[in-house]
Every structure is written in C-alpha cells, then in structure tokens.
Amino acid sequence: MSMKQIKNKPNRSAFDLSLRKCFTAKVGEILPVFMKECIPGDKFKFGLNSFTRTMPVNSAAYTRIKEYYDYFFVPYRLLWRYFDQFVTDTQASNPQFALSLTQSSSSVAARTPYIVASNVATYLNNSSSAGLKNEFGFNRALLSYKLLKYLGYGLFSASSSNQFTAGNSAIMLNAFPLLAYQKICQDYFRNTQWEKANPTTYNVDYLNGVSTKIDITPLLSTSAKNNRNLFDLNYCTWNKDLFTGLLPAPQYGDTAYIQTGQNQNVSFDNGEFSADLSSGVVEFDVDSNSNSSGLVNANTLLRGSAGLGKTDSSNVTGKFRLTNDEFSSFSVLALRQAEALQKWKEVSLSGKQDYKDQIEKHFGVSVPDVRSNLCTWIGGQVGVLDIGEVVNTNLQGINENKNVSADIAGRGVGSMSGRDEFTCSEHGIVMCLYHAVPLMDYEDTVTDLFMFKGSRYDYAIPEFDSVGMQSVPALALNPEFQTNLPIPDNSTGQANLTTDFYKSLGYAPRYVDYKTSVDVVTGAFTRSLAYWAAPMSTDYFQSLFSAISNGQKLTPAFFKCNPSILDTIFAVNADASMDTDNLLVSCYNDIKAVRNLDYNGLPY
C-alpha cells in the first residue's frame, strides 16, 4: 500500500516585506543593507530605489564613483552542513555524515550555531585595547561593531572610549547572518588569484555534537589575532586595469619542463666510476669516508677535475651530466605533453580557483553554482555618483582689489533603481550588499611601459603574441620600488620589457601596453590642487607596499579599495569610526514575497 499521495497542503500568501534603510558608508566597504530568511517555495520580487549624497567636498572634484547593490542567496547548508538534518529532524533515522570508519553522525544539536553576546563584547574590547588593525591600518573592533549593527545585532553599544557592551550579555545570538555575509565576500569579493580562501570565517561544519556554540576564545590568542575572522568587515576590490588586473604568476603552479634524462644506479669497480649510459643524467650518492671494497678514497672522485670539487667529508649527492646529443635529446611526444601541461596551467590561472569556474574554463560547460558550493548571485544595480559644483559668491568673498572671489566647493549626488526576481528552493538567507568604488586614477609618477622598451623584441611581433604572459615592472607603478637597477645591455638584442629583467609586480597578457591604458592625473592636481582629484599617489603605494623594493610580490591589500583614497577631496580623513563616513544613503527596498504561509496564521 503506497502513501505517496500523502502530502501537506500549505497555504500560500503574498507578503509585503518592503523597508527603507538610511545608512552611511565609505568607499570600499562592503555593507549589508537588507537581509531576510528564506524557506522553500518562496518567490521574491526585489525593487530598489536609492538616493545618495556625499558630505561636503573640498572642490568640484574630478573624481568618479560608482555604487553597487547586489542581492545574494546563501543556503544554510553551505554554512553548516548539518542544517538539512536539523530542520527535518531526521538525524537519528537518516544520518548523512560519518565521524569515523565505524561511527555515523547520528546526533545533531537542538539549536543552530550561535554566539554569546558577552563573548562578542569581550572580543571587541580585547581587540580594541590591543590596537588590532586591518590591512589599511583601521581599528578592527570598530569595524566589527559597524558590521554587527548593519546586520541587525542591535543590542551591542559602544562608548566614546571604544568600550563595547551587550544589552543582555547572556543571550545566545544566531550566527547565520554573520556567516552568510562572510560567505558572500569569500565567493564574490575576493581576488582569487592573490588571496586564498578562508573557510574559517564562514563555515562551522566542525559543530557536529550536542553543543553548537561558536567558541570565539581562540580569536583572542596571539597566533590568531592577525588572521581574519567572522567579525571582520570586508572591502571590495578595485575595478581591473593594467595594474589591478595583474596575475601573481604566468601560469598555475610551476612552469612545465621537458625531462631529458633519468636517474641511474652508480657502481664503483676497482676505484673507477661506472654507470649505465642509456640516459643523459646519472645520479650518485657517495660517502667520502667510505671503506667499501674497491673504493679506496672517494675524495678522488669528489675533488678531481671530473668531480664536484667537494672539500668536506660529508655525504654528497650530485649529478654527472653527459653531453652526448644522443643522451640529451627528447621526443616530439614529450614536447607535446609539456605544451599541453603548460596550456592547462595558464588556463587554470586565468579564472577563479573553484570547481564551477575551472570546469567552464577547461570544458566549456556552465556548471550550476551548487556544484562549487557557491552562494547564488541573484542580481544587482549599478549607479554613478556625480560630484557637481557649488559656487559661493557672497560678500565675504570680496578680496583686497574689491573684486568678488568665487569659492568653488562640491557635492556628490547619485540615484538608481531596478528590479530583480528570485525563486527559493531551500532554506537560506537573502542578503543585499552595498559598496561604492572610485574609478582609479594614477598620479603622474606612473611610467608608461613604452619607456622601458629598448630591444627590437620589446616591440609587438605577431609571431610572439601568443607565447605566454609578460611581467609588468614594479618601476612602472612607483619609482621607489626599484632604485638600484642596472643599466640594460641591449648589445645582445635581449628583450627587457617582455622578460623578467626588471623586478616584477605581476604578470599580464603579452604586449599589454598595446591593449589597455590607465587614467592619469598630472599638473597642479598632484600638488597645489590635490583636493581636486584623488589619484593613487607615490605616498599611497609606499605606505602599503614598501616591501616590493626588496623583490617581494604584491599583497592582497593592493587590490582592495582603501577608503583613505578620497581623503584629498573630503574635509575629514577616513578612519574606522562611522563618524567619518562620507556617503549618506537612503535606500528603499520594495520587496514582495509569495510564501507557503497563511496570511493570518489562524486555523479558520
């Protein structure tokens, strides 16, 4: 007898979840401005209307800023893999995970992962007193407090001396909003080529027992203080250009090589070195103090004209390389294999390092987000924040020549609207994140790549266009990054720009200077009129990346938008405090949802 037809028939009703949120922001910050829980069967219609003003600008600055709103869906199972069993209460009869070879995970706690308010306040206070800073030198505790407030953890408060308290210190708070925010930032706002994934910020699969309390005590240890965690506010990356689009290596992993020989056993007979000469490389391992029969003095081999010049008595390992062409040759098949391996490595590095993107890169198949354990991007809106002029010609501006002096200040205004839809098939959270990014300008200390050309091979040659990436010299971005550079010798015809002659910032497509340009600010805008523009300056680079002069690579912070970039155009410099926010935003989320719930919640 089948019970297939026995199903619950839930009521389905429409609900208005619209709300307005007024908030302040800085450029670069990724801020949650809307969040709602989802249940299976939900159908959402998102409408967005946003209006932004800026704090007073020092001038009618030639700075361009874009605003972004993005909606995401984060399934709970990506944050805590036991959620499906938890919500259906089937862990006893249908366990899904094993704890060991002989034990199933048959018990799941009675509540979802949580944090204790008093523990969070303790963490914030300890972080503040320890002076912990983020990658831009801002107080991490204040930024964590801001994130908690924007997510809706309203019971936390901060004093003027940056001391934090919780309204009900013993209350247990759901951790899913924090984890979902970090999951979105890891999936969509991380430069995957330069920054490794950090699942510890969003995943709590380790909570598989009776308790689901997230113990944040380890975050206070010395070893963990400098690591990012679930309380950290994140920053978006710059839009990609010549420098922010660089890759850390010309391919994924090491360069592919063709092996021209193999290891062989070595034997000694009456003091003479002998080996199987069927390959081009012979390896040996000799104890120089060996008393083996037939080997009177190994030093003769190690120090002789045909040896390695070994001078001590320790064990040695080395190679005798045969120069016979017969032994050093390789097959065309080996060349094909090396080329295929190199191609695979270069294609792998060109995209994100998750399953979805890698399969699309190599197989040309679009894989659903679920196969890469990614949260889902629903949609979003983009707007432009324009800075216009405000001219003051009142009598207080009369100068000594009895002429009216007009002061030109500025104000920024932006607006946008749009609509998106989404149908939910599992439990999770819908979250909208806001961020604003200036379009990058560089100070005139940036050197055009053309200036580094010397050899004929530095100029574009179509035959060499597809041989791989080229390095971008650090000197092109900042003259302080390389002060002791030898004068290039072009007598040999060796290319300088398209090789690693210069210390490298990273790698870009070959002949990249023919394929893109960067925006530059020069003249008085870099000196007396600096408040009219907000370029990436020498001081900005040097404060963050002085280590590059020692040959080190860029850090992930280089690719993130620093709120301090606009300090020149605003009267107040950016710091960790919300009081220095310079974007004033009013956002109306027109949200309609159809859900498997009754409108009144009554049985009649």
Per-region residue spans from a language model:
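Intrinsically disordered, low-complexity segments
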Residues: 1-604
